[in-house]
Amino acid sequence: MDKKVIYLATTNKNKVKEFSEILKDYQIKSLLDIPEYVEIEENKKTFKQNALLKAKHLAKYINGVAIGDDTGICVKALNDFPGIYSKRWAYPLTNHYDICNKLLDKLKHINQLNKRKAYMTTAIALYDAINKKQFVYQARVNGYIDFQVNESEFGFGYDFIFIPKGYDKAYSLMNSELKNQISARKKAIDKLIEYIDNVK
């Protein structure tokens, strides 16, 4: 039996891979499959609003079901910066290591790990353009910002500097199975699956 297709409003291959690993019962397609699609500007004030904006815009375009995801890191000592600007605050830098190093520079005066508190958060929105239904949920994982960039073939974004609470290493030093069990994205997707199962 063919898997149900859900479109993901992203061109990020790493994000598509994570969603595919967690949502194994569905075929995940993304903006990489519809190159003519023009992404909408993320101009909202919260992670939830941005996620829903992306999901709704794509769902209406394909006249189907789409998921929007907005993920970021919030550093307590920086008043929750970069927050919703996590993806674009360091522009024109695009290399994940460079962006992480730039954030570390802002914390170089703080030399105690317990004073480098942060959290990773993911907001997930699903919009069904046919039935006009929507679901939005935000999850977070508390932790700390490491003192160095932990370069690795695993991970992306801020995985290289974020140590989840209760662990002694950054996401990038974990295998994908472990990260996918404890990440904010996994928590949010679990709630999404509950919603999907309940509306079948």
Curated annotation (Swiss-Prot):
Q: Which residues bind Mg(2+)?
A: 41, 70
What detail does the entry give on cofactor binding? Binds 1 Mg(2+) ion per subunit.
Recorded GO CC terms: cytosol
Kindly identify the residues recorded as the active site.
70 (proton acceptor)
EC supergroup of this enzyme: hydrolase
Q: Name one matching Pfam family.
A: Ham1p_like
Task: State whether it acts alone or in a complex, and with which partners, per the record.
Answer: Homodimer.
**UniProt-recorded name of the protein:** dITP/XTP pyrophosphatase
> To which species is this protein native?
Mycoplasma mycoides subsp. mycoides SC (strain CCUG 32753 / NCTC 10114 / PG1)
